[in-house]
Amino acid sequence: MLPEVYSEEERKAVEEHIEACFGAFETVLHEVVSPDIHVDVCVIPPAKDRNYYTLVTMGMGAHRMNVPAELAEYKLERAELAIALPADWKVDQEAFRDERWYWPVRLLKTLARLPGECHTWLGWGHTVPSGEPFAENTRLCGMLLENPVTFG
């Protein structure tokens, strides 16, 4: 089975949306093996008005999520995920060999696949527990999905 991917037109629209909402990105962590959906991660560097990195998935929305019928009017079946990281977070390929720096990328990719694997959906207010810390350098062990407007 081929992975679900955006059409060229959809991908361009998602790239433009990411830049408009989060800022310009030059770095994209391209996924090499895509078992179900193709999930790249865009890295938006800190800026004058934003003292943090933002990582945004690009590909999760190629899969239409199984949103409950009573929410259909809100058009929530497609989404991407974002996470804010401190300005001193290491975001280079060398650092990503260490799980202490890579776990946010792994987390985004894992969450991006959840709706397809579990025939469900993710949206604002959902929580996803992990049961244990994401890496040895953090006590974080669960996710809360929030409206990205709160990043500022």
Regions found by a protein language model. Give the residues of each.
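Short linear motifs embedded in intrinsically disordered, proline/glycine-rich low-complexity segments
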Residues: 1-152
